[in-house]
Amino acid sequence: MSDLADWKAPPFPPRKVLEGHYCRLEPLDVAKHGAEIAAAFAGAGSVWTYLPAYAPKDRAEYEALLDSMVKNKDICPFAVIDKADNKAKGHLWLMEIRPAHGVFEVGFITYSPPLQRTRAATEAIYLTGDYGFGLGYRRFEWKCNNRNEPSKRAALRYGFKHEGLFRQHQVVKGENRDTAWYSIIDSEWPARKAAFERWLSSENFDAQGRQKVSLSSLNGNVA
């Protein structure tokens, strides 16, 4: 779509609760979520390998990091609440938010081991995408270190299209970062949304919790 004469820029995403079946995204609150998040990541230093920050050494350091996120008005940070036990087990941001162009990104996705590879983890991405497109955004971005193979596979599984590689894009923790770019645009979202919803349906899982149809196959991707 090239003619945008009637298009209006969406608002900056308000910090609000996003409710799902398996998870709930709550605006990050250090007092409310800090202790649970720090506990969930205890001993999980490898999670931070490709993130721009180093793994916090203790609860106080973790809460200071979370506080810096809350105070950053350029992002929309969420705690990921696992509704199985109503505990915060991760966090992510809406970031690189450019209302004038209708662009937003989900990033700094930080899932603790108990949250990884769960329906709640997948639903969190669905909720962020549905929120942004529901506000009127046109483009949903995913970017990652090109060395981060799990993140690249996840992007394809979720239905993001690979767009290319920004070589020597950043210096992170004293190392070169080539950045892989992925996106979903508004015209693609209805099909991606339907795939997410079909995969997340309880009918897609057997009595042992095993998926019947993969999200990758629903999106036509091989993760």
Where are these regions (language model features)?
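Conserved GNAT acetyl-CoA-binding A-motif
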Residues: F133-C144
